[in-house]
Amino acid sequence: MKNINPNRTQAWKHLKQHFDDMKSTSINDLFNQDKYRFAHFSKTFNNEILVDYSKNLITNETIIKLISLAIECDLIEAISDMFHGEKINCSEDRAVLHIALRNIKNTPILVDGFNVMPQINAVLNKMKQFCNRVIQGNWTGYTDKIITDIVNIGIGGSNLGPYMVTEALKPYRNHLNMHFVSNIDGTHIFETLKNLNPENTLFVIASKTFTTQETMTNALSARNWFCKATSDAQHISKHFIALSTNTIAVRKFGIDPSENMFKFWDWVGGRYSLWSAIGLPIMLSVGVSNFELLLTGAHDMDIHFYSTPLHENLPVILALIGIWYNNFFQVETEAIFPYDQYMHRFTAYLQQVNMESNGKCVDRNGCPITYQTGPIIWGEPGTNGQHSFYQLLHQGTKMVPCDFIAPAISHNPISDHHEKLISNFFAQTKALAFGNTHLTSMQKYIQSKKNYKHEQCIVPFKLCKGNNPSNSILVKKITPYTLGALIALYEHKIFTQGIIFNIYTFDQWGVELGKQLADSILPELKYESMISKNHDSSTYGLIHCYKSWCG
């Protein structure tokens, strides 16, 4: 994989010139110039997902120049390298193979000359057997009661992905009650456990290293709660399982690794791991067949990404449009608005995948970067956000490109709720793009009011300038298949941007510094020792105040 500084490419120079030509263009002008603009700037995926990117400040020339940038940055070779098991995560000397986890066609994928598919299939089969036993009531607790509650203890990728998917697929859930504990704040584990019965509760401890501070602190508290109720640590084997690679630590905890540990590999990044054993809570929640459909949807998007020409390639198109705004319009954020309540954790999930992946300031050569890399990702489900921050989107001074996502078919077609929801989706993308600045329509509005003079005075305050870009992603229905495809769509968008940014998307060294400092500060809070004089005055003052208040 080549290391190419994007802003030294010819394509980047051409895009800067093109931006100078485009910056005074309006979305309204673009639609007026092309009555078939929707047809020209929208694509479907397997007749299940429609991506409409027509409400963007782009032309055919923009797309051509952006694709030239992708080609000059050697995106096609980078895609091939990932799919063929090359160690593209060079800072950690690892392959990047979440795509292998959903390789349902079982095509051989080699890492260091070894086909990884047999070991993937072995873990997947072990997951299926275990989940079927729990779901069917054949796995019982220490008093022979069936399991009714699953508590997943993990953080980051070991929590966000499984939690998001189980929430998004609630219509497919079985009888098991799912709980997710991530925060080291004792309130999280306390509030989760206080209404549970240890006799029918199963704990899933999800940690690759089995040393993650937050996860193991919560896991030990859960084990203490369980042992206090049962008075016998031997019963742990029926109520605790591990998703990990650390056999020694898992056994020390009291879990039998040969039976109750589900492994994964160093080429699976945490934020890309819901397809692996980390996805076991998903399989427990929705069953084996639905988990397989989730994998199938992602795999089909993988094939689309790998084999489709760049100008037809949905992840590539979305990535390039994002770079257009991020690096030429200099916007700093992207908003994601799922108009589906089941998808309420989708933005938080993508926030981690994107910001932990592409929030980097050093390029693949180890040099400081002089251009913007990953954007800030934020958002809320619609229509809640409309009564919160959409005011800024419509009349503020910042450009915020938005992705609107909604299903055409609702799982809960109550009265006309869904039609009203979708009408808001369509209305918001239209209002953001076109505003209400058309003189004739404003005059008609003013003339329709009784207090004509007053309305004339407040016209400037009611004007919405429009020209705010958005993508509309309409899904036929949120199913395991379409959700898998949608997640993979964004994964590959992020990968594409990372290649063009010339960064290592799959490491996260910035997470480590805070962990190290917390480990050094912890003894100063727990014991009567003196506070280190090596702290800055702010940290010293905070620790001193904390200790004085806590006695």
Curated annotation (Swiss-Prot):
It catalyses: alpha-D-glucose 6-phosphate = beta-D-fructose 6-phosphate. Pathway: Carbohydrate biosynthesis; gluconeogenesis; Carbohydrate degradation; glycolysis; D-glyceraldehyde 3-phosphate and glycerone phosphate from D-glucose: step 2/4. SUPFAM superfamilies: SIS domain. InterPro entries: G6P_Isomerase (IPR001672), G6P_Isomerase_C (IPR023096), Phosphoglucose_isomerase_CS (IPR018189), SIS_dom_sf (IPR046348), SIS_PGI_1 (IPR035476), SIS_PGI_2 (IPR035482). It comes from the Bacteria. The active site is at 356 (proton donor), 387, 515. Pfam families: PGI (PF00342). Gene3D superfamilies: 1.10.1390.10, Glucose-6-phosphate isomerase like protein, domain 1. GO terms for biological process: gluconeogenesis; glucose 6-phosphate metabolic process; glycolytic process. CDD domains: SIS_PGI_1, SIS_PGI_2. GO terms for cellular component: cytosol. The keyword Isomerase applies. Its EC number is 5.3.1.9. It is found in: Cytoplasm. Keywords: Cytoplasm, Gluconeogenesis, Glycolysis, Isomerase. GO terms for molecular function: carbohydrate derivative binding; glucose-6-phosphate isomerase activity; monosaccharide binding. Its main location: cytoplasm. NCBIfam families: PRK00179.1 (NF001211). HAMAP family: G6P_isomerase. Belongs to the GPI family. Catalyzes the reversible isomerization of glucose-6-phosphate to fructose-6-phosphate. This is Glucose-6-phosphate isomerase.
